[in-house]
Structures are given as C-alpha cells and as structure tokens.
Swiss-Prot record:
The keyword Membrane applies. This is Chaperone protein ClpC2, chloroplastic. Keywords: ATP-binding, Chaperone, Chloroplast, Hydrolase, Membrane, Nucleotide-binding, Plastid, Repeat, Transit peptide. The gene is CLPC2. It comes from Arabidopsis thaliana (Mouse-ear cress). Residues 115-257 form the Clp R domain. Molecular chaperone. May act as a suppressor of FtsH-mediated thylakoid membrane biogenesis and may enhance photoinhibition. Seems not involved in chloroplastic protein import. Probable component of the TIC-associated stromal import motor involved in inner membrane translocation. Has an ATPase activity, but no ADPase activity. Interacts with transit peptides with a positional preference. Localization of the signal sequence at the N-terminal end of a protein seems mandatory for interaction to take place. Its main location: plastid. ATP binds at residues 323-330, 666-673. It catalyses: ATP + H2O = ADP + phosphate + H(+).
Length: 952
C-alpha cells in the first residue's frame, strides 16, 4: 500500500487551487486521511481502485510534473507511514509493523497536521530543497537542502533575514559541497527526507504553535532548522559566520512587524476596534481630513448648510445630493468631513464621523444566502450603537437591488426602517438620471431621502475651485500653474467641451496639461536616446556572441557597452545641468501656461483654439486667393466664407451660434458644392473632413428621423442619427446640406434650433453641439431667374453694368427663396449668396484646372502630357453652356482628350515614359502626337502644330 503527497512545480502556483482531502478506511478500523493541503497551488484528485485479493490502493492522479514528499515520520521508531511510502509485500505486514511501533494514532496524522498548514512560500522551499538534492545528485533531502531552499526562495521572511546576514545561495552551495560532496548522479523519482530533516519539519510546526500561528511559513522552517541545531545546515551556517541566536532574533522581529502591518492594512480594523464591520467596509473621511489627505473644497456653502440642516432633523435626516456627473457631489461630503475635523459645524453634528461605504466591498464574497444581509445588519447595529456616525453612500442608487437574490430582499428595503426612524444618518449621492430611474420609482425610499440639488458651478466659481486645488496639483506634478492657465482651463472647457460638466472637465484639463509639461521636461535628450538605442543593439550582439561561444567578439562588445554607458551618463549629467539652469531662469521649474491648456483642448476636441500664429495669420489673410485656385469666379461667396472663418478663428464670433450659416443659390454647375469641398480641403484638412448630407435622400416625411436617430422601438434606435452622430464625433467641421430644396419641409423645422442656438437634441435626449460647425446649404431655387437675367451679365459689359445686373438678379432670387422657404428659416441664416452664371473666360480657366487633373493622373503612369492653345479653345467651345455651368466642360474633356488617350494607350502607341502633345488639325480633328515616334495617327508633329503653345 503506497502513499505519497504530490506537490506541483512552481509554474502551477496560483490562487484558487486546493487539495481535496479523501478519507479512506483500512480494514480492522485503521483510519487514515490524505493530507488536505491549504496551500493555494495544488489540485490532487485521489482515485480509488481495488486490487486482487481484496487489497485497496489509493493513487494520486496529477495532470502535471510533480515532486513528492514521502514517508514523513520523525525520529522515533518507524511508523506505518514510513512503510506505506515504500513498496511492501502486503497490507497485513504493514499493519503489524504499525502496531509494533507503539505510536499513538495521532502520530500517524502528522502529515495532515503539517502539510495542510504550509503556506505557498513554505511549499516552494520544500520543492526547491528537492531540486537542490537532484542538482547535487543526492537521493535524500537533508537539513542542508532545506537551508538552500530557504535561501533560494528569495521573497519570504527567512530568505530576507539570511540575506541580511550576508548568506547567499552561491556561497552556501559551495559549503554544502565541501561538507558532503556530490552524489552518484542517479536520483530516484521520489526523494525521501533524512531523519534530521523530518525533525526540522516537526520543530517548525511547534515553532508556529508557540508564535500563535495556524500556518507554517518559511520563517517557521528556518526557526525549526535553527532549533534542531545539528546537521550539515548548522555547520554551513557556522562556516559562513552566521550567529544562530541572532538569526532567530531577526526572524521573530520581522514576524512581529509583519503582524502589525497586516493588522493595520486589513480593512483598518483591529481587535480593540468598536466598529470592525464599518472599518472593514468603509473609509473614514473625517480621519483623512484630519490627516490632510482630502482635496480642499471651495465654495458650495449653500449645499453644505442644507446638508447640515437635514442631518439635524429628528427623523428622515438623510440628505441625497443630486446633480450631473462631475459637478462635485462627493466633494460636498468631503467638505462636511473637513468642517467636522476643524470643528466648524453646529453642535448637532459636532464630533461625528463621516464614513463612506464601499458597496462593492460589502457585496463582494457573499456566496451564500444571508451573508450580505448579515453584514448589513451588523453595519447598522454598529452605527445605531455608536450614534456618532454619518454614513456616506456614493452612487446611492446601487442600494436598490444590491444583494437581492431569489426570495431575498435588497439593501434598500433593509435600510428603509432605520432611515425613516432617524436611527441612521445617511448622505446619498447620485446623478439626476439615476435618481429618476431608480429612486423615484420607489416612493417609499424616495420619501426617506431629502433631495439636495447640486448645480453646475459657473465659470467664475470653477476658476476659484481650480485656484484652491492648484497647490495639490503643483506638488504632484512638481511644477507651477499660471493664473492665466487656470482661467483658460475653466473658460475653454466651458466653451468647447459640451458633453461634460464643470469643474470636473476643467480639473481634468489642468491635470493632463501638468502631466504633459512634466513629461516634456523629463524626456531624454536626443543624443542620449540614440546612445540608448546603440547600447541595446550592442548588448543583444554581445549575448548572441556568448551563446555562440565567440568570446573574443563578446569581449569587444562588452568594452563598447561600457563606453556607451559612460557616454550616456555624461550626456544625462549635462542635460541635468542645463535643466537646472533653465529652472533657475524660469524661477521655479517647469510652468503650465495658457498655451498648454489650449493644446490639450485642441487634442481632445479637434478644435484649433491655440493662439493664431504668424504663419496662420498670413494664411487666413490670403484665404480668398487660395480658394480661387479651385473655385473660379464667385467672388461674393468666397469673400463671405473667408470673413466667417477669420471671425471664428480670432474668437469674435457669437459663442452660442455656429461659425456661419449660408445658403448658396444658383444654377447647376457653377461651383456651389466645389466651394464647400475647397474650403474643407484648405482649412479643415481634407475634403473628407466635411460632413455631406445629400438632401434628396430626405424627401419623405419619415426620413427626417435619419438625421437625429430613430425613436425608441424603431429599427436603428441604437445607431444614432447620421447628422448628430457625425457632429458628436467631429465637432469642428463643415456640414454641407446639398440640394436643400429637395428635402421634406419638416427638415427645415428641425434646423431652426441649429441655426439659432447651435444645438440639437438627438433621439436619446443627448444635446449635440453645433457651435463649432460651418453650415452650408446649396439650392437651385432661382436658377431660372438667373438664366433669364444671365444674358445681360457677361465679360462684354463694363463693371458697373455687371454689378447692377447681379444685384437685380440677387433680389429676384431672394424673392423666390422667400416663396419656397419659411421666413423663420431664412431669417436665421447669416447670408444668402447668389452664384453668378459662368462666363466663357471663366470656363476657360476651369478648363485649365480640369486639364491639370488629367495631367496629374497621367504622371502616375509616367506619361508627360501637353495640350496646345488650339485644343484648349476647342474644349471650351464644346463645353461652354451658360445654362449648365462647368459640367458640360468635363464631358467635353472626357470625349476629346481622355477617350483619344485611352485608345492610344491600349494600342501601345503611347507607353510609359512617352511625352504626348494633343492638338487640333486644320480640319478640327484631335491629334495625339507622341514625343518618341514623332508621328501618331498619321500626322507629323510639324504638320499638325503650326504654332504649338503648350500650356501644361
């Protein structure tokens, strides 16, 4: 009958593992039980099977590599366990030996008493000792191997004490080999313990009992080793110059210190505490306030006074702080704790303690029914007996449903009687939405809490709050904040971060700005970073050389490594001197300025709020010329848009309205949509930065919901609206409503609040901010009027005649717009811009732009294209149509140029690297001439081009 206790190797250490004890009854009443190890590392499953002739055997099945501790019995006569650990002829023989040993039944249960109490570190020591035995080739584990295991474990109390005495693993191994030498090399799978080692394990159990511990750790093993006093381990310690009595003293001292730390950390409670449950599941805010660990609370005087008034009531003395997230509800409770700590409160609450309850900790670990209720009742009983406790529950709506299982009641219902009778003074805090969703649904709970509204502070109040918090953030980030930075944080967060609330968003701004400035000053110099990169490469090459046993190369790499480390140290020292000089020059080190706050806001929102640089100033002043490179003519529209952008960029626009809102009216193909694209590409980064809504998709009444999102219960409710979601993601953008007259009239009703207030509420009730968007609507209304009056507008008229004609047409188009759109819609627009019809001269300039696009596409294929003046005139003649604008021109270029080029490229007459000239012959036919052949399509170059004037 063989027994073994199997231990997993270190990779299997981890929480939540255990050994399940299996009891097995032998014949004739001999009862034994497998060791139920409590160490969090093992999972041994015992399986039982019956051998022939009635013998019963139990094997431990383990799904991992294992080490075994076998036949533990101590120094007395051999016991049943000693023989059970070895192969044996039969059960009756073993039982007789057990009877003849004369030991009590308790002595046979030593393994159970021992190993179920081993800590993770102690098990690791035993495993390491067996590994040391294998390394030395010994087929036993003695005291010397246990000593080596204690040193090798590295993290326990025993290892720390031995290290402090100057005892290391390398020297100890040398001493052990000097004394006992190396073994034969053949080591059995199961390595037994020597009698002295068994004695050490027994003594470690006694030491643990004397210290009042119900576990055996590495420190107890070391104490047992010292108490045994003889054996190889004692000689090793003596040779290394260690004093056993001194080691014992140090171990006991460290054990005592650890116990003190554990008592102070474990929930803050101690054996003498009158409120162990409260201290375990709560945090004493008053104590933190006395220690100065809470942030100062600025303002909020009316709210704190109202809370004190409610707390002084006889019944229902439970205030509930209600406000938006981030307005400072928790800060009011902390402010009350600070006032109590300083004595600045009425006598009704003087000397009381504010404790914040951690609901998550209270619920955590309550596996069985009744555990949560028991904890909560203990908590309430402690508060009732003390009569000096004010309980603060943040996110008080979590009470509803907390701990409720099938057939159980939740925390809110348990607390209701105490809240109503005044036995429990409780401050709750929750958001407006959660209060409506959870607490208002339960009128019985709602009447027990007295609501205290916590409004969002104004910008001026937020600035005062930031000034009060400045010192804490300066100490944390080791820098200074200027007054301008604090003012900018409050103002810019209020203006540009619309989905959050003051003062939280302003505090986050100064916090992140401080982090940015500190990291910027802490960066390594560029030279040091390069050297660090070289050092990593050299170290890698050195290690590879060592692995390949190229020691000469490894030596040269080592020398270079030393040189690089010295260079890095020199660079860092120089950098510190420079930084010190800069800090002295700046009078106090790094400083967070207004520009740092502006940069963080721009990073968060994508809105450029930094001060306008000189480069950007010149760019804004030259905006008209830049836009005219893409949009030909239409000076009025280009000037109006440029004025709006300049106004917004310097901060002179109305902060409660969009940057600008225009309606572009004119005939088709004159550049209405092209101007919006050009503006998006020039100022907002790219054409993709524009939100384009084709209003022909919103012709039916029900499609209006696509803009703001479907109502609840309809398909697409969770996806949000096309307009609102796009603006929420990119608040600084251009929104183009193309062909606005095609939309259903209800769309215009929805746009009224966008144009006036710069805001829109989506289907989920969230407010979307349009204050940083540029709204452009295009329309073809009035195009018939422009077409009729266009005959009197042309390049053959003088300047005054053209202006008067344009003004007359603009007034006519405006009248048509008034007939089509409602007055309240048109009245909210900043400007109604009428686009002129294109003249032939303007069409010629547009032809240049379109031909350049074709040239650019051919350059990708390494083909150089030139066109003559005659060809360009031919394109303009065919593509000019005042009624249709520039779109016929695109069709003419496609037909005359692109089709001819495509045919020649497919026939391989034009290949990569060719230079191509496109001209028109005397008969008006298009001729494509290649620079490599000189003749393409049957015409010589000199015949076709009498006077070629390439423009591109």
């Amino acid at each position: 009958m063989a027994w073994s206790i199997a231990l997993l190797t270190p990779p299997f250490f981890g929480p939540g593992r255990h050994v399940q004890a299996k009891e097995y009854r032998e014949p004739r009443g001999c009862v034994m039980k497998m060791s139920s190890l409590k160490a969090p590392v093992l999972r041994i499953q015992a399986t039982e099977y019956r051998e022939p002739r009635g013998r019963v055997k139990m094997m431990s099945s383990l799904q991992a590599p294992l080490l075994t501790i076998q036949s533990f019995s101590g120094l007395r006569a051999p016991s049943a366990l000693d023989y059970l650990g070895r192969p044996s002829p039969g059960f009756l023989v073993k039982y007789k030996l057990a009877k003849s040993s004369g030991r009590e039944k308790a002595s046979r249960c030593v393994p159970k008493a021992m190993f179920e109490r081993f800590t993770e570190k102690a098990i690791k020591v035993i495993m390491l000792s067996q590994e040391e035995a294998r390394r030395l080739g010994h087929n036993f584990v003695g005291t010397e191997q246990i000593l080596l295991g204690l040193i090798g474990e590295g993290t326990g109390i025993a290892a720390k004490v031995l290290k402090s005495m100057g005892i290391n693993l390398k020297d100890s191994r040398v001493e052990v080999e000097k004394i006992i030498g190396r073994g034969s090399g053949f080591v059995a799978v199961e390595i037994p313990f020597t009698p002295r080692a068994k004695r050490v394990l027994e003594l470690s159990l006694e030491e643990a009992r004397q210290l009042g511990h119900n576990y055996i750790g590495s420190e107890h093993l070391l104490l047992g080793l010292l108490r045994e006093g003889e054996g190889v381990a004692a000689r090793v310690l003596e040779n290394l110059g260690a004093d056993p009595s001194n080691i014992r003293t140090q171990v006991i001292r460290m054990v005592g210190e650890n116990n003190e730390v554990t008592a102070s950390v474990g929930g803050g409670s101690s054996g003498n505490s009158k409120m162990p449950t409260l201290e375990e599941y709560g945090t004493n805010l008053t104590k933190l306030a006395e220690e100065g660990k809470l942030d100062p609370v600025v303002g909020r005087q009316p709210q704190i006074e109202r809370v004190v008034q409610i707390l002084a009531r006889r019944t229902k003395n439970n205030p509930c702080l209600i406000g938006e997230p981030g307005v400072g509800k928790t800060a009011i409770a902390e402010g009350l704790a600070q006032r109590i700590a300083s004595g600045d409160v009425p006598e009704t609450i003087e000397g009381k303690t504010v404790i914040t309850l951690d609901m998550g900790l209270l619920v955590a670990g309550t596996k069985y029914r009744g555990e949560f209720e028991e904890r909560l009742k203990k908590l309430m009983e402690e508060i009732r007996q003390s009569d000096e406790i004010i309980l603060f529950i943040d996110e008080v709506h979590t009470l509803i449903g907390a701990g409720a299982a099938e057939g159980a009641i939740d925390a809110a219902n348990i607390l209701k009687p105490a809240l109503a009778r005044g036995e429990l003074q409780c401050i709750g805090a929750t958001t407006i939405d959660e209060y409506r969703k959870h607490i208002e649904k339960d009128p019985a709970l709602e009447r027990r809490f007295q609501p205290v509204k916590v409004p969002e502070p104004t910008v001026e109040e937020a600035i005062q709050i930031l000034q009060g918090l400045r010192e804490r953030y300066e100490i944390h980030h080791k820098l200074r904040y200027t007054d301008e930075a604090l003012v900018a944080a409050a103002q810019l967060s209020h203006q540009y971060i619309s989905d959050r609330f003051l003062p939280d968003k302003a505090i986050d701004l100064i916090d992140e700005a401080g982090s940015r400035v500190r990291l910027r000053h802490a960066q390594l110099p560029e030279e040091a970073r390069e050297l660090e990169k070289q050092l990593r490469q050299i170290t890698k090459e050195k290690n590879e050389a060592v692995r390949s046993q190229d020691f000469e190369m490894a030596g040269s790499h080592r020398d270079r490594e030393i040189e690089l480390k010295a260079e890095i140290a020199n660079v860092l020292s120089r950098g510190k001197e420079v930084a010190k000089a800069e800090n002295e020059a700046e009078e106090g080190g790094p400083t967070v300025t207004e520009s740092d706050i502006q940069h963080i806001v721009a990073t968060w929102t994508g809105i450029p709020v930094e001060k306008v640089s000189s480069d950007e100033s010149s760019r804004l002043l030259q905006m008209e010329q830049t836009l005219h490179t893409r949009v030909i003519g239409q000076d009025e529209a280009v000037k109006a848009i440029s004025r709006a952008i300049r106004r917004a960029r310097v901060g002179l626009k109305n902060p409660n309205r969009p940057i600008a809102s225009f309606i572009f009216s004119g005939p088709t193909g004159v550049g209405k949509s092209e101007l919006a694209k050009a503006l998006a590409a020039y100022y907002f980064g790219s054409e993709e930065a524009m939100i384009r809504l084709d209003m022909s998709e919103f012709m039916e009444r029900h499609t209006v919901s696509k803009l703001i999102g479907s109502p609840p219960g309809y398909v697409g409710y969770t996806e949000g609206g096309q307009l609102t979601e796009a603006v929420r993601r990119r608040p600084y953008t251009l929104v183009l409503f193309d062909e606005i007259e095609k939309a259903h009239p209800d769309v215009f009703n929805m746009m009224l609040q966008i144009l006036e207030d710069g805001r829109l509420t989506d289907s989920k009730g969230r407010t979307v901010d349009f204050k940083n968007t540029l709204l452009i609507m295009t329309s073809n209304v009035g195009s018939s009027v422009i077409e009729k009056g266009g005959r009197r507008i042309g390049f053959d008229l003088d300047h005054d005649e053209k202006d008067s004609s344009y003004n007359r047409i603009k007034s006519l188009v405006t009248e048509e717009l008034k007939q089509y759109f409602r007055p309240e819609f048109l009245n909210r627009l900043d400007e109604m811009i009428v686009f002129r019809q294109l003249t032939k001269l303007e069409v010629k300039e547009i032809a240049d732009i379109m031909l350049k696009e074709v040239v650019a596409r051919l350059e990708v294929k390494e083909i150089e294209l030139q066109v003559t003046e005659r060809f360009k005139e031919r394109v303009v003649d065919e593509g000019f149509d005042p009624s249709y604008g520039a779109r016929p021109l695109r069709r003419a270029i496609m037909r005359l140029l692109e089709d001819s080029m495509a045919e020649k490229m497919l026939s391989r007459d034009i290949k990569e690297g060719d230079s191509v000239i496109v001209d028109v012959d005397a008969e008006g036919s298009v001729v494509v001439l290649s620079g490599t052949t000189g003749r393409v399509g049957g015409f010589a170059a000199e015949e076709a081009m009498e006077d070629p004037i390439p423009i591109l």
